[in-house]
């Protein structure tokens, strides 16, 4: 897969050097390249070049200019509409600031509806109290009639509710309207089909399941429960709102089945209606317009597939596909197949996703995969870590003249970046893959300059490349750019929704601003940083210019920031354009870590939750047993974590990356400090729980000998003397600190063993060995599948062998291998270091034993694979 080699500069003297890279190609044939991206969504007046003469003989140039003008007109109309909404809302807020509740209601309607005239307060009161009150009511009523027909308004009988619910078309509340109609005795009876279709069926959206059921009942009542008159628009309205419902994540909840049951009942209703129609021979009436024609269509199938994909339920997906194909002769279209491919990808059924993709290519021209489909399949290549197939797919798009979108390029870049981080999947071409990804990204200048509409997705793709390359300078610049931009946007959105006079909930603003994926990529860039290595992006001219522009465009000193948010909008980053010292990496990584966990510095992790000591003591005093106390404490810690700590940033993956930073930089003290501060062991937790529980119960018995407690003196004496005892203060402090700690799992113990190897610390290795032995007895480990437990045991045992090999304790290393050969499949990469040392020592006996164990397992594995293939 190797293509041409790039010419590299000669290595310079000193620690810095430039790297030679190779660009992998998907095939031997050289493919022509072309610019991608098409017409940008954000077209400015300058880019239209209105004064430039057009070549009327060139149809491509005319088509290009026409597309530009259409996009510019569309953007201009959108900007005008947004500006009008902002002006109206700001005017309403200013005018309504100091009014009474009655004045607020009247003036809000007048300002929003555009009937506000700039008289002073006395004149407005005169209008309300004087003879012009009727004209104001008539004006408001006239505006309300534009939202709903008069027949429906009379049944709602609340113009203020209609205005409040529907005046903002971006955030309309149809649930309130449906609920009010349902409370009316007339409901929707007698309302014409035309009025229903134009004002409700085509506009009502974001309905809850309860509102959908109410609307369905009212629609049935409107047609006197004659199922043959339940038309297509009604079906589309119900299925559309059902498909937009958010599924419940609670496995015990029946909500998802309720939604699915409603969909099934609608399909059964349609089938029943078709039987009635066939029996009454009403086809002629339908043709004459007496009875509406009812039929299932592609839109309804789209809704069913959409909701089934949200549920991640294969049986329900197959049920809908089979039903529409067999009974209604409706096959999925291109968009449906793309959703189904995404559905199979989420479930991990990769083979079925590829089958769907192959089917689309050979069905018909209408089913031909588009850029969205190719983007979906590139994301699947990312999960499979198959860079060759990803490159082939992209070249296939070019050959078939399918213009790649920014999303397509980002998906390809993420795939190449992910594969480059895996030494096995990258086949030794990690740097070449990352350089190739940067070159693909530069095919669209709007992407690398962050001018496209895919701001977040593009930064995510670029940061993935920086993370695996260790380019901390560019990664921190991109992270800074994203956070400051996103914070400003979220802050302005909050002001628009809540008004300038309400206090800002900075915790919610920061929670929606801090992206855990970008945060982990930044930590990974810190971890992979090496002072003596030049960033790979400097390997070609365009990349060097892009990197320089992005870094220089960041204002770490906030000299040019004019932000109402004040100091809360500032990130704890060093005021340096680039980082050159390991100490700077350690300091900044810790500061950014704390900043993310503390919701932008709004909380302090070092401070225990308010009243935590009293809460824990009360729980211990009221608990009936240690198990009951442990359960209640874990529940309380979960509440603290939700309220105080950004749990999106604190997860097992991010803490592994965070601990890797000092490990790779050789900072033992910082590694141990971070591990103890942000992780805990299950056995330590149980010891503190037991100690606090026993101390609290003993204090109760001592203070009130005659009191009724759940623990007696004899039970206290029965407690094992070997149980580690902590004083009350230390137990309370430990349990309170668990709000920002992650329980240690096999991955953390493996990282600890790597640290012992890195720092040549025998005490740390011994402690890790003993602690993991205790961890293996916990339910968290025992509940894992047998294959996964064996895999984790093998990984840790391999690290132990490497440690003993480094310490020249070859007998102990051989002892581990021989003792575990019945449970662990030892392969040569796991014992490579030990084998090399034994060869140097010419220990032929140990070499023979070692290779027999390795070869025996290899032969048995090969035999098992052969039997499986024959079966």
From Swiss-Prot:
Pfam families to which the protein is assigned, alphabetical = PPR_2
What InterPro entries does UniProt report for this protein, alphabetically?
A: Pentatricopeptide_rpt, TPR-like_helical_dom_sf
Localization per Swiss-Prot or TrEMBL: Mitochondrion
Stored PROSITE patterns: PPR
Q: Which UniProt keywords apply?
A: Mitochondrion, mRNA processing, mRNA splicing, Repeat, Transit peptide
Organelle targeting peptide span? 1-72
Cellular component terms, GO, for this chain's entry?
Answer: mitochondrion
Q: By its UniProt entry, which PANTHER family does this protein fall under?
A: OS03G0856100 PROTEIN (PTHR47447), PENTATRICOPEPTIDE REPEAT-CONTAINING PROTEIN (PTHR47447:SF24)
Fill in the misc note: Involved in mitochondrial-nuclear incompatibility, a major determinant in reproductive isolation between species, through hybrid incompatibility of Ccm1 and its interacting partner 15S rRNA between yeast species.
Q: What does this protein do?
A: Regulates mitochondrial small subunit maturation by controlling 15S rRNA 5'-end processing. Localizes to the 5' precursor of the 15S rRNA in a position that is subsequently occupied by mS47 in the mature yeast mtSSU. Uses structure and sequence-specific RNA recognition, binding to a single-stranded region of the precursor and specifically recognizing bases -6 to -1. The exchange of Ccm1 for mS47 is coupled to the irreversible removal of precursor rRNA that is accompanied by conformational changes of the mitoribosomal proteins uS5m and mS26.
Q: Which family does it belong to?
A: Belongs to the CCM1 family.
Per its record, how is this protein called by name?
A: Mitochondrial 15S rRNA processing factor CCM1
């Amino acid at each position: 897969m190797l293509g041409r080699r790039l010419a590299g500069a000669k290595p310079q003297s000193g620690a810095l050097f430039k790297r030679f890279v190779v660009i992998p190609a998907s095939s031997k044939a050289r493919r022509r390249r072309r610019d991608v991206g098409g017409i940008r969504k954000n077209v400015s007046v300058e880019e239209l070049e209105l004064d430039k003469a057009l070549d009327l003989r060139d149809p491509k140039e005319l088509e290009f200019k026409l597309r530009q003008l259409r996009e510019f007109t569309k953007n201009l109309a959108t900007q005008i509409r947004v500006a009008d909404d902002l002006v109206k809302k700001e005017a309403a807020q200013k005018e309504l600031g100091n009014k009474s509740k009655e004045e607020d209601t009247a003036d809000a309607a007048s300002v929003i509806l555009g009937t506000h005239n700039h008289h002073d307060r006395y004149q407005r009161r005169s209008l309300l109290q004087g003879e012009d009150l009727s004209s104001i009511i008539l004006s408001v009523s006239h505006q309300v009639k534009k939202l709903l027909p008069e027949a429906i308004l009379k049944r709602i009988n609340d113009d203020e509710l209609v205005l409040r619910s529907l005046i903002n078309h971006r955030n309309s509340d149809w649930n309130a309207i449906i609920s009010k109609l349902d409370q009316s005795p007339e409901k929707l009876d007698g309302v014409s089909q035309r009025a229903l279709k134009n004002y409700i069926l085509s506009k009502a959206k974001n309905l809850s399941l309860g509102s959908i059921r109410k609307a369905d009942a009212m629609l049935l009542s409107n047609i006197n429960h004659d199922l043959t008159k339940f038309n297509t628009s009604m079906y589309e309205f119900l299925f559309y709102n059902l498909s937009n419902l958010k599924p419940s994540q609670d496995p015990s909840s029946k909500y998802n089945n309720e939604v699915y049951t409603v969909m099934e009942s609608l399909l059964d209703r349609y089938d029943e209606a078709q039987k009635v129609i066939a029996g009454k021979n009403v086809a002629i009436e339908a043709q004459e317009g007496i009875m509406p024609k009812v039929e299932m269509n592609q839109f309804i199938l789209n809704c069913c597939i959409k909701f089934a994909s949200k549920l991640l339920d294969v049986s329900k997906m197959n049920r809908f596909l089979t039903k529409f194909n067999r009974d209604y002769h409706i096959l999925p279209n291109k968009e449906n197949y793309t959703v189904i491919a995404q559905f199979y990808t989420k479930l991990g059924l990769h083979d079925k996703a590829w089958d769907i993709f192959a089917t689309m290519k050979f069905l018909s021209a209408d089913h031909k995969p588009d850029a969205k489909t190719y983007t979906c399949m590139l994301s699947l290549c990312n999960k499979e870590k198959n860079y060759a197939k990803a490159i082939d797919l992209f070249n296939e798009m070019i050959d078939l003249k399918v213009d790649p979108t920014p999303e397509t390029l980002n998906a390809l870049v993420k795939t190449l970046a992910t594969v480059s981080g895996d030494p096995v999947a990258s086949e030794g071409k990690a740097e070449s893959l990352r350089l190739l990804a940067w070159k693909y990204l530069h095919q669209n200048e709007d992407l690398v300059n962050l001018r496209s509409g895919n701001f977040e997705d593009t930064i995510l793709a670029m940061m993935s490349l920086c993370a695996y390359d260790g380019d901390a300078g560019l990664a921190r610049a991109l992270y800074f750019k994203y956070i400051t931009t996103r914070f400003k946007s979220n802050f302005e959105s909050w002001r628009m929704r809540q008004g300038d006079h309400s206090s800002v909930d900075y915790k919610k603003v920061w929670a929606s601003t801090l992206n855990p994926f970008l945060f982990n990529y930044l930590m990974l860039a810190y971890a992979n940083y090496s002072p003596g290595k030049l960033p790979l992006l400097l390997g070609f001219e365009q990349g060097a210019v892009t990197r320089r522009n992005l870094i220089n465009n960041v204002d770490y000193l906030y000299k040019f920031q004019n932000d109402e948010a004040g100091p809360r909008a500032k990130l704890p980053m060093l005021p340096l354009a680039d980082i050159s010292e390991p100490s700077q990496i350690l300091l900044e990584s810790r500061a950014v870590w704390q900043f993310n966990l503390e919701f932008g510095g709004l909380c302090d992790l070092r401070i225990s939750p308010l009243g935590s000591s009293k809460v824990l003591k009360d729980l211990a005093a009221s608990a009936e047993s240690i198990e009951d106390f442990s359960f209640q404490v874990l529940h309380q810690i979960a509440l603290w974590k939700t309220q105080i700590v950004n749990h999106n940033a604190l997860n097992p993956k991010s803490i592994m990356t965070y601990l890797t930073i000092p490990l790779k930089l050789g900072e033992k003290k910082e590694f141990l400090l971070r591990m103890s501060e942000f992780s805990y062991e299950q056995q330590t937790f149980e010891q503190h729980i037991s100690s606090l529980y026993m101390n609290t119960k003993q204090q109760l018995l001592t203070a009130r000998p005659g009191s009724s407690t759940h623990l007696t003196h004899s039970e206290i004496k029965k407690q094992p003397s070997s149980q580690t005892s902590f004083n009350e203060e230390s137990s309370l402090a430990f349990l309170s600190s668990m709000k920002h700690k992650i329980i240690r799992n096999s991955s953390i113990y493996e990282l600890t063993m790597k640290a012992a190897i890195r720092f040549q610390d025998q005490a740390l290795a011994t402690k890790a060995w003993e602690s993991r032995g205790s961890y293996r007895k916990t339910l968290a480990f025992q509940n894992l599948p047998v294959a996964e437990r064996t895999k984790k045991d093998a990984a840790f045992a391999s690290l132990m062998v490497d440690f003993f090999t480094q310490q020249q304790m070859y007998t102990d290393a051989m002892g581990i291998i021989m003792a575990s050969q019945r449970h662990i499949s030892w392969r040569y990469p796991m014992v490579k270091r030990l084998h090399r040392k034994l060869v140097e020592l010419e220990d032929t006996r140990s070499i023979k034993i070692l290779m027999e164990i390795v070869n025996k397992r290899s032969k048995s594995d090969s035999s098992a694979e052969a039997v499986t293939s024959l079966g």
